[in-house]
Amino acid sequence: MSAITIRAMTIGDYEEVEAFLAVHFFKQEPLMLIPQEDPKQSEVSSAEAELHRSLIPQDLSLVAVDGERIVGVVLAGELVPEDLEREYQEAEQKEITCLLDKIHKFLAGIERQANIFKHYGVERALYLYMLGVDVSIRRQRVGTRLVEATIELGRQRGFPVVTSTCSNQNSKRLMTALNMECILTKDYADYKDEHGEIVLRASEPHTSASVVAIRL
């Protein structure tokens, strides 16, 4: 029986969560490993860190802990239809200065196109924004347990749908194994700049992103 337990994330976890994600998410996520002309473009912006902090007070984010040590993280928050259009417009209008800007622009586009609200006929959803697991305990079902706990939390809080956008094949495989439906998949190669150059040159097999969801 695993000693790893799952509990609600608190604002007191914030600093440790950010340190954890720096190692176990941003240095592992295939999209973040795409080489950039300037290595500084791969750094995580303060705006991204502030987004993480802003989600915690919603009491929808979780941590997996082994004793006192965080070994897994889910950042999640409520999503409403207006968010899709607002985030898309913000991403379209924002000057791209780093790799995360490029990623956010692509993902905002696919989420707007998938439109899980229209797909399911609902007005709110629990959005699983980020899933990270300690690299030393991969394949011990910690990620699966975190997603299962997020789905159960969504059910308890009265959300009609839980959704996420999988940026790599590992997360897509994990979530579809939990009966999450794949609403839309788009290849990164379809995202090109004004010169026709591919913006996100992702490596196999992580060459597409997928919006997944489950009705509760």
From Swiss-Prot:
Disruption phenotype: RNAi-mediated knockdown results in decreased levels of N-palmitoyldopamine (PALDA) and N-oleoylethanolamine and higher levels of N-palmitoyl-derived fatty acid amides (FAAs), N-palmitoylglycine, palmitamide and palmitoleamide.
Residues of the site described as Regulates catalysis and binding of the amine substrate: P30
Membership in a protein family: Belongs to the acetyltransferase family. AANAT subfamily.
Residues with site note (Regulates amine substrate binding): E29
Reaction(s) catalysed by this chain's protein: a 2-arylethylamine + acetyl-CoA = an N-acetyl-2-arylethylamine + CoA + H(+); serotonin + acetyl-CoA = N-acetylserotonin + CoA + H(+); serotonin + butanoyl-CoA = N-butanoylserotonin + CoA + H(+); serotonin + hexadecanoyl-CoA = N-hexadecanoyl-serotonin + CoA + H(+)
CDD domains: NAT_SF (cd04301)
The name this protein goes by in its record: Arylalkylamine N-acetyltransferase-like 2
